[in-house]
């Protein structure tokens, strides 16, 4: 526990959305995050789809966005718009099936939802980690940084800052430390 006193810890969590059990006030998981922040000072980067599976548009859940954005130990980041494929692409890898123009349109739809909640995320992570060079270029043009998979996205030139990660800490050969902050 003493190493927590020397470093900041930031934990990234994907797929939060305004559905009970997925990050709503009063959910057991939210209590765990609050306790980790209180006890250890952990900070969280929440990657949030702006209209999860077409069922939870953020603009209809502004109070949910406000709940999270009012916590100074949380950063809200974009995690696609639908978090699923609309054109027969692979699973939930929304940006794997989009060309440049399709990605720009999808990002615009996402930013519109966020804007209606008086918030514009600076960071982005692709649902399912995957994209192609064209959609990756569009993502890089619209966000300050992209959280990428350390192996799946190596060949993509995003044209913006990238932060590498894995599916889980058990898959990581080493823990990344950046500016005195552990990155999980």
Give names to the regions the model predicted.
Residues 1-71, 120:
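Active-site beta->alpha N-cap acidic-glycine motif
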Residues 2-3, 10, 56-58, 63, ...:
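Active-site-adjacent pocket scaffolds in enzyme catalytic domains
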Residues 14, 49, 81, 150-152:
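Histidine-centered beta-alpha loop that forms part of the nucleotide-sugar donor binding/catalytic region
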Residues 43-133:
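Metal-dependent polysaccharide deacetylase catalytic core of the NodB/CE4 family, i.e.
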């Amino acid at each position: 526990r003493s190493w927590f006193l020397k470093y900041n810890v930031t934990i990234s969590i994907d797929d939060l959305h305004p559905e009970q059990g997925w990050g709503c006030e009063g959910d057991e998981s939210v209590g765990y995050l609050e306790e980790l922040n209180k006890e250890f000072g952990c900070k969280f980067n929440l990657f949030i789809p702006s209209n999860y599976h077409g069922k939870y548009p953020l603009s209809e859940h502004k109070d949910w966005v406000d709940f999270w954005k009012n916590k100074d130990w949380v950063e809200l980041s974009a995690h696609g718009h639908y978090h699923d494929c609309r054109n027969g692409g692979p699973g939930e890898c929304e940006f794997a099936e989009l060309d440049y123009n399709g990605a720009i349109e999808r990002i615009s739809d996402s930013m519109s939802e966020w804007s209606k909640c008086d918030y514009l995320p600076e960071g982005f992570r692709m649902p399912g980690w995957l994209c192609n060079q064209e959609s990756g270029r569009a993502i890089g043009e619209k966000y300050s940084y992209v959280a990428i998979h350390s192996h799946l996205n190596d060949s993509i030139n995003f044209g913006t800052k990238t932060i590498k990660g894995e599916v889980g800490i058990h898959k990581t050969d080493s823990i990344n430390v950046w500016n005195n902050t552990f990155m999980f």
